[in-house]
């Protein structure tokens, strides 16, 4: 479940990241640890560049100033800024563009047409649906029902 502060924190961090030349990939607030950990994953807007330690440091310093200014998080916490690394999980719009045509596994809840897991080749994603090719047949899954999309690495066509 997404922590209730995440939408506010993302709305603060996303434009800051963009000004610095980064994409905010994901933000998670781990409150089951003491002190809690706010983890922020970034990557350069330029797809040819890798995320460096200096990138993470620059974003961390800038975000720390903003977080202190708005004082959204009560008490002590740890801010961690890092690269998302290589992940099979597709999250951002950029992921869905980069991995178009790749084999994916999509988990939906509630099940769509009686199935909770769909495997096929990614055709794309928009505001309303995630589109897959299943043996040449286009299937459009309601985006609101999509729980996760992962690269499967398996041939499905």
Curated annotation (Swiss-Prot):
Keywords: Cytoplasm, Ribosome biogenesis. One of its GO terms (cellular component) is cytosol. It is found in: Cytoplasm. It holds the Pfam family RimP_N. GO terms for biological process: ribosomal small subunit assembly; translation. SUPFAM superfamilies: YhbC-like, C-terminal domain, YhbC-like, N-terminal domain. The keyword Cytoplasm applies. The keyword Cytoplasm applies. InterPro entries: Ribosome_maturation_RimP, RimP_C_sf, RimP_N, RimP_N_sf. Its main location: cytoplasm. Belongs to the RimP family. Required for maturation of 30S ribosomal subunits. NCBIfam families: PRK00092.3-3. This is Ribosome maturation factor RimP. The lineage of its organism: Bacteria, Bacillati, Cyanobacteriota, Cyanophyceae, Synechococcales. The gene is rimP.
